Amino acid sequence: ATKQETDRAMAGFLKRLVPKKFRKEGVVIPVVRLQGAIMASGSQFRPPLNLATAAPALEKAFAYKDAPAVAISINSPGGSPVQSRLIFQRIRDLAAEKNKHVLVFVEDVAASGGYMIALAGDEIFADPTSIVGSIGVVSGGFGFPEMLKKIGVERRVYTAGTNKAILDPFQPERESEIEYLKSLQLEIHQVFIDMVKARRGPKLADDPDLFSGLFWTGSRGRALGLVDGLSDMRSELKRRYGPKTRLELVSAPKGLFGRKSPGI
């Protein structure tokens, strides 16, 4: 038996020693919701999902001493790979530090960076119609050199360093710049692929499209090994920990003027 299983068995034994009238009925599972586009910064009208906004609630949830697990609900189309990986790592660090099982539940979507965060789960569940995957890297923008010519505007750029103005949208693209950008994308993509392989391992199907950037429904994602089961949070937690299990939504503590305090 694992240490976690031994601890649970011991906790159950000790609980039975307490007179029934003094026992707390049902297991309490802390729930953290991670939703929205993953960005380093945003606005009060469109709050971002990043480590600073996610960390306080995560720290609070993993501090539930008697909870055997932490449930994380994810609803994100992705965004910054850096912030995605930082959130992933914080969840794994807390899980190891507090000895908690992590159950991830995908709502509408956990794609790209959203799926990267989902990899922090020891188990991943999704709705059959959820969207999962999109294991790839994309970047884009616009170019305006011809427009400037038409309106009679001359672009003047002065640099110290031959590549300081690389990918300037007001200058024609150069093949060398495109190749450099692609090399960065490939490097980031490989980090993502390595994370998926490390976390999902032998569960993954041998499918050539798995790391192509495609996305799938939860049902197909299960067949590909991207998710472990098709279920909703409430049903799965009650099935696992008993019908009296209570789900407790955890949010970031509020600071001065009622604003949520950012974490680090």
Predicted features by range, described:
Residues 1-127, 138-264:
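N-terminal organellar transit peptides
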